[in-house]
Amino acid sequence: MTRKTRIQPIEHAAEVDDNGYDRPSKSQLKREMHELQVLGQALVDLPKDALKRMPMPESLSDAVREARRITDHEGKRRQLQYVGRVMRTLTDDETAALRTALDAQRGVNKAATARLHWIERTRDQLLANDDALTEFLRQHPDADIQEGRTLIRNARKEAQQGKPPRYFRELFQWIKTASGTPGGDDEAADEAGDDHDDEA
């Protein structure tokens, strides 16, 4: 007895990838999940004020804030996995907006860091060479010449005597103000002053 088999018509998938599959591979899904996990970790690592500016839905914001609060290693790991799970519920547009905002934040940080390094190099040049002040004043004619000379002289003196770097830090602030850099980087100035402690 022969059996008749019924042939079903093949329906073509709406979208087919390069390999002929109609859905993403497991490897592709894993890569995407890992990317979202990394993005979530980047959000958790952001400074508090930068985190407030991120375009996040409330559920993700709550999960990220909770991950920042947890200090236990295993608890934090689990919470970060939860952040990744919440991120998988976001639309592509929401994820793209988050990536754009994070890239912009990283760009701002790089520019600010480069600016602080320039100020530190300028300070070192001013302390090492008297001609550097003339060049600095040529580039920044609105700078207070007398204050600059006084700070340089006092910073050199305190370095020779091994005193705390008060004028060293004030010179940093003077350069920042004279060159038109906005304030608010006192911590960086303090760190730069601490470097001086090690050298002295």
Curated annotation (Swiss-Prot):
<dbReference type="GO" id="GO:0019843">
    <property type="term" value="F:rRNA binding"/>
</dbReference>
<dbReference type="GO" id="GO:1902626">
    <property type="term" value="P:assembly of large subunit precursor of preribosome"/>
</dbReference>
<protein>
    <recommendedName>
        <fullName>Dual-action ribosomal maturation protein DarP</fullName>
    </recommendedName>
</protein>
<keyword id="KW-0694">RNA-binding</keyword>
<feature type="compositionally biased region" description="Basic and acidic residues">
    <location>
        <begin position="12"/>
        <end position="25"/>
    </location>
</feature>
<keyword id="KW-0690">Ribosome biogenesis</keyword>
<feature type="region of interest" description="Disordered">
    <location>
        <begin position="177"/>
        <end position="200"/>
    </location>
</feature>
<dbReference type="InterPro" id="IPR006839">
    <property type="entry name" value="DarP"/>
</dbReference>
<feature type="region of interest" description="Disordered">
    <location>
        <begin position="1"/>
        <end position="25"/>
    </location>
</feature>
<keyword id="KW-0699">rRNA-binding</keyword>
<dbReference type="GO" id="GO:0005829">
    <property type="term" value="C:cytosol"/>
</dbReference>
<keyword id="KW-0963">Cytoplasm</keyword>
<comment type="similarity">
    <text>Belongs to the DarP family.</text>
</comment>
<comment type="function">
    <text>Member of a network of 50S ribosomal subunit biogenesis factors which assembles along the 30S-50S interface, preventing incorrect 23S rRNA structures from forming. Promotes peptidyl transferase center (PTC) maturation.</text>
</comment>
<dbReference type="Pfam" id="PF04751">
    <property type="entry name" value="DarP"/>
</dbReference>
<dbReference type="GO" id="GO:0043022">
    <property type="term" value="F:ribosome binding"/>
</dbReference>
<dbReference type="InterPro" id="IPR023153">
    <property type="entry name" value="DarP_sf"/>
</dbReference>
<feature type="compositionally biased region" description="Acidic residues">
    <location>
        <begin position="184"/>
        <end position="200"/>
    </location>
</feature>
